């Protein structure tokens, strides 16, 4: 899953271990097909991705101390965010993605780190079952939302396994609305009120960055309202360029229950929306 992050603030330092003397770093880095994330794996040594995990967690205000917390990392990719949570003291981390851990480089990184509290779960955000994976104090939902064909369903599913806070980061279209002619414009350049109206821009092919995995670009208000409609209380934490970070906790009104779909036992059973 893609995300681009510019630093906004510094996170308190966590304990980064020295590189084991018996580890072949060159072999490790070459064994991974694609390094997506940049993270200080050992003191002074960074994975060769371009997306800074440190900046992402800082912009999202993920606590430096996660002692005793149970964490779900949705769209984990290389696993760097999950392993950073382990470093910050989380008691258990479930790293979720669609591909195999070998394809993503997760297995190689886990072995190099000698991690014992992070486990990989191959699956989809659309099928989060608390009876299978439990519930979580912290859910990381970074660079995923705009890659989803069914974003509201995904947020409903996050609510099922949440007992704490969702930290979410996504593309937003407030500063990057794709206009006719494939030019990007500020949403407010069309009308100042549009940033206050929940909007989702649909990408039917690869209009955004030449990537067929991009489906919907929300504006900030749409993200807030989507979480609220799932029974979560959401807030904007930071915005930089065409990215924004949010936090959401349980406590809002579940408007899904008041809809025709929400009132349908068939729909709620088939989609497992029994929160």
State the predicted function of each range.
Residues 125-126, 136, 140-141, 149-275:
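S-adenosyl-L-methionine-dependent methyltransferase catalytic module, highlighting the catalytic core
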Residues 2-41:
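N-terminal, positively charged/glycine-rich alpha-helical extensions of SAM-dependent methyltransferases
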Residues 69-77:
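Conserved class I S-adenosyl-L-methionine
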Residues 17-33, 87, 117-119, 138-139, ...:
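N-terminal targeting leaders
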Residues 47-69:
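Conserved alpha-helix/loop element of class I SAM-dependent methyltransferases that forms part
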Residues 62-63, 127-134:
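Short amphipathic alpha-helix with an adjacent loop that forms part of the alpha/beta core around
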């Amino acid at each position: 899953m893609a995300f681009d992050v510019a630093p906004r603030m510094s996170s308190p330092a966590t304990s980064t271990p020295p590189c084991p003397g018996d580890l072949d770093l060159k072999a490790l880095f070459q064994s991974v097909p694609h390094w997506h994330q940049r993270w200080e794996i050992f003191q002074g040594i960074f994975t060769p991705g371009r997306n800074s995990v440190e900046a992402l967690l800082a912009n999202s205000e993920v606590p430096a101390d996660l002692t005793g917390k149970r964490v779900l990392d949705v769209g984990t990719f290389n696993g760097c965010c999950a392993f950073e949570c382990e470093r910050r003291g989380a008691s258990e981390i479930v790293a979720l993605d669609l591909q195999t851990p070998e394809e993503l480089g997760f297995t190689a990184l886990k072995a190099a780190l000698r991690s014992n509290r992070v486990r990989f779960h191959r699956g989809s955000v659309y099928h989060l079952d608390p009876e299978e994976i439990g519930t979580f104090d912290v859910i990381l939902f970074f660079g995923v939302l705009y890659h989803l064909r069914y974003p509201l369903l995904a947020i409903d599913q996050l609510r099922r396994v949440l007992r704490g806070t969702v930290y979410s980061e996504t593309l937003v279209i407030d500063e990057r609305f794709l206009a006719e002619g494939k030019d990007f414009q500020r949403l407010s350049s069309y009308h100042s009120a549009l940033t206050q109206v929940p909007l989702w821009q649909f990408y039917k092919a690869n209009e955004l960055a030449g990537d067929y995995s991009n489906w919907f670009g929300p504006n900030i208000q749409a993200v807030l309202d989507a979480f609220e409609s799932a029974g979560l209380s959401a807030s904007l934490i930071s915005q930089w360029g065409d990215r924004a970070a949010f936090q959401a906790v349980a406590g809002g009104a579940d408007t899904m229950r008041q809809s025709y779909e929400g009132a349908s036992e068939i729909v709620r059973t088939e989609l497992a929306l029994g929160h």
